[in-house]
């Protein structure tokens, strides 16, 4: 059987909203930020699971036979982490889908317009007929995500591509959704400032999770 499909899903769960509130607080320490992002990734994976194919099964309990379900799409999922900001986000997703294959990509966006993107590392499994889940905490201008999608074209054609965000800008969503990509997010905000950051957003997710780099 198939779950319900959608293009954009805003997660409005009360627990997720509380987690989002916590990680947006100025002065949050890295450990607490990572923990909150991991939790959000896990809850988002639960929502996403409702769209996967499944079948009815029967299992033997100590006292008889019970009806249940089995997700048949589990072995088709490929998770993609974007260094370094998405690592705790992907960790949460992997708690729900531990058997998923895992790819890693290094992408860097310049700090000034036109916010060019460079891809300096990519290691991903074969993507043909897979369900590709790209976890990136922030979708601001959309340049990084578009650059990643273009870089992945050389690695196969997924049956479905899904983007997980914690916060998305309207601009970024418009660009990604035009490509037929499903997007899950916890919040949609209108403003992207001159530095390419979502406002009010939450700041630089990579720096918040791991500290500011020296370079």
Curated annotation (Swiss-Prot):
Residues that hold uracil according to the record: 198, 203-205
Domain of life: Archaea
GO molecular function terms listed in the Swiss-Prot or TrEMBL record: GTP binding; magnesium ion binding; uracil phosphoribosyltransferase activity
UniProt catalytic activity: UMP + diphosphate = 5-phospho-alpha-D-ribose 1-diphosphate + uracil
Signal peptide: none
InterPro entries: PRibTrfase_dom (IPR000836), PRTase-like (IPR029057), Upp_A (IPR034331), Ura_phspho_trans (IPR005765)
Statement: the UniProt record of this protein carries the keyword Magnesium: yes
CDD domains per the UniProt record, alphabetical: PRTases_typeI (cd06223)
EC number assigned by the record: 2.4.2.9
GO biological process, alphabetically ordered: UMP salvage; uracil salvage
Activity regulation, short description: Allosterically activated by GTP.
Cofactor binding notes: Binds 1 Mg(2+) ion per subunit. The magnesium is bound as Mg-PRPP.
SUPFAM superfamilies: PRTase-like
Phosphoprotein in keyword set: no
Chain residues that bind 5-phospho-alpha-D-ribose 1-diphosphate: 84, 109, 136-144, 204
Record Pfam families: UPRTase
Cofactor(s) the protein requires to work: Mg(2+)
Pathway(s) where this gene product acts: Pyrimidine metabolism; UMP biosynthesis via salvage pathway; UMP from uracil: step 1/1
Family: Belongs to the UPRTase family.
Record's function text: Catalyzes the conversion of uracil and 5-phospho-alpha-D-ribose 1-diphosphate (PRPP) to UMP and diphosphate.
Protein name: Uracil phosphoribosyltransferase
Source organism of the structure: Methanothermobacter thermautotrophicus (strain ATCC 29096 / DSM 1053 / JCM 10044 / NBRC 100330 / Delta H) (Methanobacterium thermoautotrophicum)
Gene: upp
